[in-house]
Amino acid sequence: MKKKALILFIMASAALIIYPNYVKSQTVEPIIIGAPIPRASTYGQNGERSMILAMEEINAAGGIRVGTVKRPIKLEIVDTRDEEPGVPTSEVLLAIEKLILDKKVKILAGGPCMSECCLAALDLYPKYKVISIVNIGCWTPGWHAKTGKDIATYKYSFRLSGNVAYWIPNIVTLLNNIKEKYGFNKMYITVAEAAHCKAAAAAVEKGSVAGGWTIVGKEVHPLATTDFSMMLRDVRKSGAQVLFIWDHTPEALAMVNQWQDMKIPAPAIGFVGPTEDPVMWKQTGGKVAYLVEFAGEGGTLPGQEITSLTKPFFNAFKKRWGDEPRGTGNVPSYTVLYLLKDAIERTGSLDVDTLVTAIEQTDMISAGGRLRFDKTNHQAIYGTDPKETLMPQLLQWQDGKRVCIWPSKIASGEYKLPPWVKSPK
């Protein structure tokens, strides 16, 4: 019996000598990451799933090395509800503030997602000296306009998700490509009553008119609108040859169904929130056919190879959750924890100011392209070359599949005109 106890003692001692960091990682406190997320919304669910996947991968590999010790990540998720109709900004801010104070977090990653809430939240982070990395939504150009005017005050804030200032030039380029190919030049614009939607409308109008388009109609509809038949009749009457849409709400799916049922002779192109979901073909009975959807940050569509990390992310997500990733928010949310891991391990520190400097200096390959930040406003840089920037993506529903058609460097197929639409050429 004594001999057996001695052998066990020797084995345990050997484990301490050979695997000291492994043993330490089992006993140290986790690194707490506060995650403000609108959990009822599609985008919030995208972000939450991808953050959980990254956390599980990092923890399975031993955690994050802080000096000589590896520590696991723990996500403290709070439901901000900012994508739900009627939830005031004050309640969203209160949820974030409560997370900071109750859980003593020094790093936040996630949302808010709604642009108005995201802008208001910027003033919380310098107050409490906590890092915030927005990786779900908040597509308003107002965010980087505000941080860029006073980066010394807003130094704790970073945005890993993209914004319409990046998205729209890509979309306008696609629109002009379609214009030249098919001879179209008349456009109708419809958007939801939200800051980033109206900013998208203004930017598309400006870019398209410069490219030779004529805007034959414009409409802004309230959030949660479900009947678009009157607007679509106006589209038909206007002679529009393209219908540009920007509406992030789940209710916007009704517009696509009605567009298809009414066979509106104008291809639908833009951002219709739920239609990036891989279940949409089945759910709508194929009524999303030929819709061109801006699908957020690149890296979530079948067959993409933006970088060597794109397919591993896609496959890991599908294995973990049983579905292909949707679009908006997924890749930034997966990337954000690897970004933090990189910054913490480079500095060996969890000091907030030290990490701010490290995040500013980030230059890493992600599932969505090359990740770097603009040091003047802390916005992650997006473009059209994955060797230099993060990537956007546009898909078209073709024969039940989500096909990436733009930007050209990551496209897996070409745009197809709906069969009921006639080209002047």
Give residue spans per PLM region.
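Extracellular/periplasmic periplasmic-binding protein-like sensory domains
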Residues: W259-Y334, E345-R346, C404-G413, P418-P424
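Beta-alpha junction/loop-to-helix N-cap segments that form part of ligand/metal-binding clefts
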Residues: V28, Y43-R49, I64-G148, L160, ...
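Extracytoplasmic ligand/sensor domains, especially the bilobed periplasmic-binding protein
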Residues: V105-K218, P267-E293
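Segments of small-molecule ligand-sensing domains
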Residues: A316-N330, K341-C404
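Immediate post-signal peptide segment of exported/extracytoplasmic ligand-binding proteins
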Residues: Y22-G34, R65-K74, N176-K186
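Short, polar/charged alpha-helical segment
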Residues: G44-V66, A202-A210
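Extracytoplasmic "Venus flytrap"
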Residues: G34-I52, V78-P85, P112, T190-A199, ...
